[in-house]
Amino acid sequence: MWRIKIAEGGKDPYLYSTNNYVGRQTWEFDPDAGTPEERAEVEEARQNFYKNRYQVKPCGDLLWRLQFLGEKNFEQTIPQVRIEEGEGITYEKATRALRRTVQFFSALQASDGHWPAEIAGPLFFLPPLVMCVYITGHLDAVFPAEHRKEILRYIYYHQNEDGGWGLHIEGHSTMFCTALNYICMRIIGEGPNGGQDDACARARKWIHDHGSVTNIPSWGKTWLSILGVYDWSGSNPMPPEFWMLPSFLPMHPAKMWCYCRMVYMPMSYLYGKRFVGPITPLIQQLREELFTQPYDQINWKKTRHQCAPEDLYYPHPFVQDLIWDCLYIFTEPLLTRWPLNEIIRKKALEVTMKHIHYEDESSRYITIGCVEKVLCMLACWVEDPNGDYFKKHLARIPDYIWVAEDGMKMQSFGSQEWDTGFAIQALLATNLTDEIGDVLRRGHDFIKKSQVRDNPSGDFKSMYRHISKGSWTFSDQDHGWQVSDCTAEGLKCCLLFSMMPPEIVGEHMVPERLYDSVNVLLSLQSKNGGLSAWEPAGAQEWLELLNPTEFFADIVIEHEYVECTSSAIHALVLFKKLYPGHRKKEIDNFIVNAVRYLESIQTSDGGWYGNWGVCFTYGTWFALGGLAAAGKTYNNCLAMRKAVDFLLRIQRDNGGWGESYLSCPEKRYVPLEGNRSNLVHTAWALMALIHAGQMDRDPTPLHRAARLMINSQLEDGDFPQQEITGVFMKNCMLHYAAYRNIYPLWALAEYRRRVPLPS
């Protein structure tokens, strides 16, 4: 039986931590664990997911929940609440519904104070890891039999009805993910016609019907070339010399978005080496299975710009293809021949590997994310198969693995700090401190222990890094990468706790550490007033024309985001109230400029585009929260009035809100089909309207939304899992499994606290 382990490092000599692994979450299989009843419960969860997999595609993340609830002997003791049609919501009923969800959610807190949860959904995360450990000869060690069983379960359970796999679990089938998951099944041990429900045969048919893997997008071409089932001459160049360019050039690594930089860093190393894994009998078979013409007759040069229409979200402009062609025809032949291969290419590979090692060490070998992790790990193995660098990477693979009723998947990297920051604010909003003091103390302890205490090591600016001291990451302290909105939410939590008695919530954070957080936030504001996420924005927008991916948008440079800007306003307004003498003028200017930015990016229909959640509902919740924190109201702010009109206009017949993930790639509001509502979207919209003072004008829309949430609460105090709610880079969705608890809880808390209700 699978069990989650919290804040454990084990005895691996290649594993180390900055804070004794606080926030770390890993899974292990224990064949002796669990009672027959517990095992039956897990199996029932798997079967229920499989039966409903085409209706609700994100999992309920039930395995660890069942484990925690069992370990704590949880039993819901508060009677369920039902609000009938036409019945008003009393303060007593709102309180009872709120206490039920607080009681349930508190039982899900881990021993170190955070709330574990899946953050996955993209279907291109796991297959490259399987390919990597296959190439390096570590497949059996990393993924023994029970792991393989769960990997296959995940692949089977998320195969679309047409035989393919989408970019993410709710998406239409794409060549990229269909090819990767087909290869993954074959490596794990399925035959060409094997797999549940004829998975392999159906997938291969989809691939052939859509032109074969010559139509796979560029990242797929890279991975297939590495594996040996594609030829490097069919890929566009990724010269490692890029890492030696002078800093005055507009296209320089320091000016790239950090994730883009970190993906193409190891990719360029592997490309520069033209590395190809061992050509095993399986690789020979895949060369026959994945193409519609003989492998040795393919004109690889012609395949470089090919991309299946199903995968194409960002068509490359002509100027970009022209650049690739020039590099391919003129530059690469020179750099790969003597003497330039010895004078320049060799040096470029050394410089690139120096950057890889620096980033690995700075993140305790977690790296910035799962795509980068696997590429950096493979690059370290290519450099030295028996070296410590690779062994340190192996030790951190468990940090990325997650198991649920739909199988084993690879996480983006973990959302421990992000989820916990919002969970704490939701619980604080309940005003039930007397009932959850221990929960709050543990959460406070986790937040304090998760703050990044130092900048990256050495001359970090020469390695294109920004200050991180005082920040919070998205996941845990070991990850090391500062994020502005995570920092703002962490700071806000610490400030809120500082206003409470330490005998209840524990020792307050010292002011100097709060000042460090403020330094990070102030350093990330752009000239337009907006806040970037990881590093200062400011590179020229035209560089996005060089976006080398086909299925993402806005990935080349750092941008400003409504969510980051709003979170920072919230935090700095509260900080200014508690510490009025610290950098007052700078903070005042920050807030004024940030508000101006929010008002400037509002869409014509009154919403804000959400960059990290679905979509206009999410962005509008953040924006209205930021505006309200800065003193804007419905009466003195046109943007707020337009936003209220927008939200009221899209409220569904049942009182909720429901937005399709298609809003994200299409950049326009798209409702869920069938007049459906989503409880997370409903919570965001409800809180947004409360920020805008809707209760002072007409509380009816708020009552209708609260009624839907109360009546949707399950018997144990949980809420049902519905559609996917997270997104990144416009076109790829993320499943934040904790959202279904955090946001309805928070919305009910704000509703009970701020909307007048009869006793």
Swiss-Prot record:
Per-repeat ranges for PFTB: 148-189, 514-559, 591-631, 640-681
InterPro entries registered for this protein in UniProt: SQ_cyclase_C (IPR032696), SQ_cyclase_N (IPR032697), Squalene_cyclase (IPR018333), Terpenoid_cyclase/PrenylTrfase (IPR008930)
EC number: 5.4.99.39
Keyword flag Isomerase: yes
Catalytic residues as annotated in Swiss-Prot or TrEMBL: 485 (proton donor)
Gene3D superfamilies: 1.50.10.20
The reaction(s) this protein catalyses: (S)-2,3-epoxysqualene = beta-amyrin
Keywords: Isomerase, Repeat
UniProt pathway annotation: Terpene metabolism
UniProt entry tagged with the keyword Nuclease: no
An annotated GO cellular component: lipid droplet
GO biological process, one term: triterpenoid biosynthetic process
Any one GO molecular function term: beta-amyrin synthase activity
Family, per entry: Belongs to the terpene cyclase/mutase family.
Role played: Oxidosqualene cyclase that specifically catalyzes the biosynthesis of beta-amyrin.
Protein name: Beta-amyrin synthase
Species of origin: Bruguiera gymnorhiza (Burma mangrove)
Organism placement in taxonomy: Eukaryota, Viridiplantae, Streptophyta, Embryophyta, Tracheophyta
Gene this protein is translated from: BAS
